[in-house]
């Protein structure tokens, strides 16, 4: 079993100011978005100009941060934040939701499109291929923080990783499983899936490769966005089987996690949209 290296979450500290790895992962994501966006402009595959891309980035950042935070509050810990509403503003303590961030960006795209006279679906198609590498960067941030670890796996599996930060969850899980209790006593922690790295590979690298290559040619309006929507939903749904469910929610109906249930509409809408927009080309 490999032990998580327990990186210092703070990259640089100057007096009271601290630059955290997690914040850096977001910054890197926005840099990659801009770099890829300019590549697409140069290739003639974008509705953006260099100036409008920079303008949209501001809208996108607001959508990611506000939507991601509100999504986490509403989808995952609503009762806690209802009791302590000021904690909503403590973003530095963590707590962001992709699905909330996605909805925030969709709203930003709609507002930006109205302002600049760009069709919503055309703008969605342009933005979709620029997003996955940013998601990959965010998952590396999760891994460095040692958060969002995976479910317990076999002690002899080559991918098995112990997360010192999960000791409380390890003890709770071992209380209901004699074999896990034996492992915990022997190794001090349970072997878990490094699910952050699975999500990095699936939602980040694989999704980027699929959407980027598909969008290198002109496609029917709405089809690229649908591919991203359905592709993310499928990859996230798969990865959630290895990810530890949130302790305050656990598994929901049909033994699925909140992340899986939030991904189901994305899968359905993505598949329906991909087929429907593709059929329009045939007519």
From Swiss-Prot:
GO terms for cellular component: plasma membrane. One of its GO terms (molecular function) is phosphatidylglycerol-prolipoprotein diacylglyceryl transferase activity. Its EC number is 2.5.1.145. The keyword Kinase does not apply. Keywords: Cell inner membrane, Cell membrane, Membrane, Transferase, Transmembrane, Transmembrane helix. One of its GO terms (biological process) is lipoprotein biosynthetic process. It is found in: Cell inner membrane. A 1,2-diacyl-sn-glycero-3-phospho-(1'-sn-glycerol) binds at residue 139. InterPro entries: Lgt. The chain crosses the membrane at residues 17-37, 56-76, 92-112, 117-137, 194-214, 222-242, 255-275. It is a multi-pass membrane protein. The keyword Zinc does not apply. Belongs to the Lgt family. Catalyzes the transfer of the diacylglyceryl group from phosphatidylglycerol to the sulfhydryl group of the N-terminal cysteine of a prolipoprotein, the first step in the formation of mature lipoproteins. NCBIfam families: lgt. This is Phosphatidylglycerol--prolipoprotein diacylglyceryl transferase. It comes from Neisseria meningitidis serogroup C / serotype 2a (strain ATCC 700532 / DSM 15464 / FAM18). The gene is lgt.
